[in-house]
């Protein structure tokens, strides 16, 4: 984060392989560097308690120029990782299901009604207090933080494993 705090994730390629390939590919390209968490919903607010980022425009409308297949149950893909505290999942449009690209959200608390509807693919293993702090920041219209919550640099350690480019769907 811009303030020096860190959020460390563990990714689960066996749960959502193409989603993980996509995330790693974007990280390696520096796509997420200097992007913001443009939407934050604390647990006390209606809606899923989460922080959302990964949009190069910072508006909630940006993407990498392509989509990926949604790896979740209602889209015909078995993904049993539930939306519990700390889980990371891909954001997408309501329709079509295959509309995820780069935006993701991290759960602040459990939200079972999202299970099977979004592609979960990892979990926060360090820095959940940073997620909580971001979620509690003062918000304006469309749950946008009044003070910018910027990801200064996003890195990935694949521990020597090569991950292929994701399978992409044209827009």
Sequence positions of predicted segments:
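Cyclophilin-like peptidyl-prolyl cis-trans isomerases
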Residues: 1-171
């Amino acid at each position: 984060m811009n303030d020096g705090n860190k959020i460390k994730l563990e990714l689960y390629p066996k749960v959502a392989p193409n989603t993980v390939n996509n995330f790693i590919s974007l990280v390696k390209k520096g796509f997420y560097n200097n992007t913001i968490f443009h939407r934050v919903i604390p647990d006390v607010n209606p809606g899923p308690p989460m922080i959302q980022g990964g949009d190069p425009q910072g508006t909630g409308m940006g993407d990498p120029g392509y989509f990926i297949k949604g790896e979740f149950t209602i889209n015909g893909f078995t993904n049993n990782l539930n939306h519990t505290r700390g889980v990371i999942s891909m954001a997408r449009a309501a329709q079509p299901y295959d509309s995820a690209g780069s935006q993701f959200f991290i759960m602040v608390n459990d939200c079972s009604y999202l299970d099977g509807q979004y592609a979960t693919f990892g979990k926060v293993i360090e820095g959940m207090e940073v997620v909580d702090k971001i979620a509690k920041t003062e918000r304006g219209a469309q749950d946008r933080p009044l003070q910018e919550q910027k990801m200064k640099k996003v890195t990935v350690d694949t521990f020597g494993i090569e991950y292929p480019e994701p399978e992409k769907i044209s827009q």
